[in-house]
């Protein structure tokens, strides 16, 4: 029966590799602490993921849909698609920077209005394992998940929204964490400048710095781009 798993894994990877390649800089990656990694994504290089990791990604998307439904039945007027049935998003810099958001909260029931001074709100949802979830619930998004923090700040900037309700599902206990995050114009500008810097470097055939020149650095060893990063080992 192990052969079934092997066939399944191979087909999942094959399907992933057959999908249309991204030809823009995704906002979800701009906050990463390795500029070289972000640049490789922008340049269309493909990260290497195991079938198990790809399944985990898919499970996360399904769980986010479930969280959205829980929120709707609890009094949130949450929209995850626009009037054309497409995911909310934006495109800027002549299509070189794009973002797609989980949703917008346009209103809430009366018992929830005390928590939200204005609408609409950006809604962004993540699924986290227990330890990561606990850390975020204790210290907040900005300190524990800088990539996600950059993501929501840029979303708010480009969609002209003043607040984001960040929601995290604990995949081990089903607990939910909510954090109301205000728009920070300085942070958004800083991340936007970083995106422009990466695009310009690629246009000039310049390499952005890697987080480490040592391929044995723990983040490099876990990176899906470890086999295509030209800086490592130089």
Regions found by a protein language model. Name each.
Residues 135-149, 154-234:
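Metal-dependent nuclease catalytic regions and adjoining charged, substrate-binding loops involved
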Residues 125-127, 225:
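Residues immediately flanking
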Residues 79-80, 122-124, 163-168:
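A structural signal for short, well-ordered beta-strand segments and their strand-loop junctions
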């Amino acid at each position: 029966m192990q052969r079934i798993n092997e066939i399944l894994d191979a087909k999942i990877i094959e399907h992933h590799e057959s999908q249309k390649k991204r030809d823009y800089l995704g906002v979800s990656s701009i906050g990463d602490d390795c500029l070289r990694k972000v640049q490789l994504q922008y340049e269309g290089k493909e990260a290497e993921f195991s079938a198990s990791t790809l399944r985990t990604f898919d499970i996360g998307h399904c769980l986010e849909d479930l969280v959205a439904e829980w929120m709707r039945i609890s009094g949130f007027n949450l929209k995850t698609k626009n009037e054309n049935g497409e995911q909310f998003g934006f495109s800027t810099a002549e299509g070189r920077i794009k973002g797609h958001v989980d949703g917008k909260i346009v209103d809430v029931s009366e018992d929830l209005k005390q928590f939200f001074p204005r609408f609409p709100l950006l809604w962004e949802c993540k699924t986290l394992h227990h330890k990561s979830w606990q850390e975020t619930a204790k210290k907040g998004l900005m300190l524990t998940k800088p990539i996600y923090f950059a993501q929501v700040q840029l979303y708010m900037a480009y969609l002209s929204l003043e607040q984001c309700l960040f929601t995290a599902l604990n995949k081990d206990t089903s607990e939910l964490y909510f954090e109301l995050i205000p728009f920070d114009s300085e942070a958004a500008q800083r991340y936007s400048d970083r995106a422009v810097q990466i695009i310009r470097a690629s246009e000039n055939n310049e390499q952005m710095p890697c987080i480490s020149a040592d391929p044995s650095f723990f983040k490099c060893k876990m990176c899906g781009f470890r086999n295509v990063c030209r800086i490592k080992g130089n």
